[in-house]
A protein has these predicted regions:
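A metal-dependent, Asp-based hydrolase signature
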Residues: 62-111, 132
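Short helix-coil transition/hinge motifs at the ends and kinks of transmembrane helices
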Residues: 48-56, 93-99, 161-168
C-alpha cells in the first residue's frame, strides 16, 4: 500500500473512501468496446452482406473509432446505442451509403437490449482492494455518472464476489447523478451530502482526471487517487489544499505486500 495513504488510514485522518465506478472498480471500457464492436459488426453485415468478413471487420473498426472520438468529446454521459447510431450515421454520410435508416437503427438499438442488464467484470484486484480498506474499518461508497439501475447491478456483482471470496458481506452504498448532468463538481458535492461524509477526510478514487479528480477537488475533497491505467509516467498538476496520488490501478495502491 502507498505508505502515505496507509498512514492517513491508520491515523484516522481519512474516514471514508469514495469510489468512481466505471474503469475504477469494473472494467467498463473492455465491456463497452467488445459489445459495441459486436453490435456494429452485426449491423455492418446487414448493410454490406456481399462484402467478405475481412472488409466488414475493417468497416466496423472505422465506425467504432468514430464512436470513440465522439465519446471523448462528450461533456455528458451518452448511451451506447445512441453513440453507435451517431457513429454509424457519420460513417454512411461520409461514404454516401444508402440504407433504410429506420430499419437499421431499430435493429442496432435492439442489439443492445441486454447491455445495461449486465455488469462489466470487476478488475482482478477490485475485491482484494476493498477488503484491504475494510481491514482498517473504513467504510466505502460509490459515486457514478451512469444510470442508477445499472450502477446497482455493478454494485451487486461486486458485493456477491466479495461474499464469495471472504465469506462475509460488505456494505457499498452508491449515489448516481442523472445522465443529462454535467460531469463536474456539483455531482461530487451531491454525492458527499448523500453519503453524509466530510470531504476533507474522504479519499476519492477515480480514473478521470477531469470528471473525477479535479471535479472532486473543486467540490472540496482533499485527498484523491488518480488511476492512469498505464505504465507510462503521467504528469498531474497538483492543486492547492489537496493531495493527488497518481498510480496505475487499485492494485498498486492497495496491494497485499503492504500488510506483510
Amino acid at each position: 500500500m502507498n505508505r502515505e495513504i496507509k498512514k492517513l488510514f491508520k491515523s484516522s485522518i481519512i474516514t471514508f473512501v469514495l469510489f468512481d465506478m466505471d474503469r475504477t472498480l469494473v472494467d467498463t471500457h473492455t465491456y463497452f468496446q467488445e459489445e459495441m464492436t459486436n453490435s456494429i459488426l452485426h449491423t455492418v453485415s446487414k448493410i454490406f452482406p456481399a462484402k467478405p468478413l475481412k472488409k466488414q471487420l475493417k468497416i466496423t473498426k472505422e465506425i467504432v473509432d468514430i464512436a470513440n472520438k465522439i465519446y471523448e468529446q462528450q461533456r455528458y454521459p451518452i448511451l451506447v446505442d445512441t453513440l453507435s447510431e451517431l457513429a454509424l450515421s457519420q460513417y454512411i454520410k461520409e461514404k454516401k451509403v444508402k440504407i433504410n435508416k429506420k430499419k437499421v437503427y431499430k435493429e442496432l438499438k435492439s442489439s443492445y437490449k441486454d447491455f445495461y442488464l449486465t455488469s462489466p467484470q470487476p478488475f482482478p484486484y477490485t475485491i482484494e482492494a476493498i477488503h484491504k480498506i475494510k481491514s482498517f474499518n473504513i467504510p466505502i461508497g460509490v459515486y457514478s455518472h451512469a444510470q442508477n439501475e445499472w450502477t446497482r447491478i455493478k454494485v451487486d456483482r461486486i458485493r456477491n464476489e466479495y461474499l464469495k471470496r471472504y465469506g462475509e458481506g460488505i456494505k457499498i452504498p452508491f449515489f448516481t447523478t442523472d445522465i443529462t448532468d454535467l460531469k463536474d463538481k456539483e455531482g461530487w458535492i451531491k454525492a458527499g451530502k448523500y453519503h453524509k461524509i466530510n470531504p476533507k477526510r474522504t479519499l476519492v478514487v477515480g480514473d478521470s482526471l477531469t470528471a473525477d479528480i479535479y471535479a472532486a477537488i473543486d467540490a472540496g475533497y482533499k485527498y484523491a487517487v488518480y488511476l492512469t491505467h498505464t505504465n507510462k509516467y503521467v504528469e498531474v498538476e497538483q492543486r492547492a489544499h489537496a493531495k493527488i496520488f497518481v498510480t496505475k490501478n487499485l492494485s498498486t495502491v492497495f496491494n497485499q505486500h503492504s500488510f506483510l
